[in-house]
Amino acid sequence: MCGRARLPTDVSEIKQDLKIEWDKLGDYRPRWNAAPTSELPVVTAAQGGRTLEIMRWGLIPSWAKDPKISRTTFNARAEALDSTPAFRGAWRAGQRCLVVADGYYEWRKADKQPFAVALGNRAPMTFAGLWDTWHSPSGATINSFAVITTRPNALIAPIHDRMPVILASDCWAAWLGEVDAAEHELKAMLKPYPAERMTRWPVDKRVGNARYDGPDLFEPLREAS
């Protein structure tokens, strides 16, 4: 499960690293405690190049009658993308995206201690995601996404039984549909990221309050183990 994220603070770095052609972020601002139903930066691709845009966290299928379904669709299990009704349509349509974050938070089940998780070099993470577009009866349009999860690596296993799929740069083009890839090749990407390239540390339990949002949340909590 991945239910909290720290949003990128350096958008210019993202644009350069991911070779963004179109910036549709609007009035973007970094956040240190983004929760499901928040808006996060997402990368999609079309013939005109890669687009960096804002989407709502929690996928609303195009057929949904109520957008509240997004409260339970912020994560998508890699093993069931083509069989889970909420995600099956986006998967079959090739509506894949990259969700960009500086890191995420996870809670250790034994004592509910939260941990921050990041790449060892502190580069932005690129989560594998699916997206969809929903039209309300009144005509409003919502673009939304889910973060795909997989089994944990050795770093995450002591605190949780799932982790987000983090894609390395050599997977981006295929995942975004810029180059042809068979379904089995795409599914092979949905694996745990190497533990030796990641790091984690305990943080303040205030991160459990989605209304609290400050840079101190990502700082190590020295007295915790």
Per-range role (PLM):
Residues 1-225:
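Short linear sequence motif anchored by a di-proline
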